Amino acid sequence: MMPTVIILAGGLGTRLRSVTHDHIPKPMVPVSYQGENYPFMSFLLSHLYGQGIRKIILCVDHLAEQIVSYFGDGHRYGMQITYDNAGPVLTAARVKQAMEKTDDYNVIIHCGDVFHPLNIDRFLQNFNQHPENLMQIAVHKKLRSEHTKPNLVIGKKGQVFDYKKKNAGENRLVLDTGVLIVRRGILSYISDSPEESLTENLYPELIKKNVVGTYESETAFYDVGTPAEYSRFCNYVEKVGIRPLLEQKSSANGVA
């Protein structure tokens, strides 16, 4: 059975204000498909549906009513969508509250402004081969872009040694793509503080414990958090023709 996916979709989208004008939440920015506009989130959900994912928890806050109004409970799309509105708290605090809504032992966490069409079966298989890890981060192997920079130091076997380092020494620098899978054991590392962040608090703590692995992919990914990357994703959709989430229909977008 496929795990629940927690999507972090509550950010203010400050870098994308020239597109949203603070009138729409970042996951709902319009993307054209066959002459009609669909929200970015519908393309992400379509990919997840095509990979067998059926249960989604959307962590919302900023202009949340627009997301809830559009997707509802997910029934008409063949999915089960629930919502968690923790208010203006940081990402680890959001994840902790959302994980309390599911009994799944493994949970996928996905940034709500990222489209990375991974093969979820392979992603899970790799995680299951490393039961010692509490977290596995999807990383890009060879990305070289003016808009993104490598931020994880990993060893030969994919174990994460450091975060936000510019020099890897004997190791390699790769880019965290905003998709990860975790075991419930991470909950013991997240305090009840609303100021708990995934990257600033949880990542360093788990890296020190040597329980963070990676899944490497060469599949192109898109972060619509900036106008340049948003435009790049729109061009990708136009060129490749990937489908948004449509009522009772699925889309198996390109996978790694």
Predicted regions and their residues:
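N-terminal glycine-rich phosphate-binding loop and ensuing alpha1 helix
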Residues: 1-65
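Residues at the starts of beta-strands that form the adenosine-phosphate
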Residues: 4, 54-56, 80, 134-135, ...
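Hydrophobic packing residues within well-ordered alpha-helices of enzyme cores
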Residues: 16, 67-71, 190, 233
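Well-ordered alpha-helical segments embedded in enzymatic catalytic cores
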Residues: 40-43, 94-97, 202
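Short beta->alpha linker loops
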Residues: 62-63, 87-90, 118, 219, ...
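Conserved beta-loop-beta/alpha segment of the NTase-like Rossmann-fold superfamily
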Residues: 68-69, 74-156
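Catalytic-core segments of class I nucleotidyltransferases/pyrophosphorylases
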Residues: 108, 115, 121-129, 143-144, ...
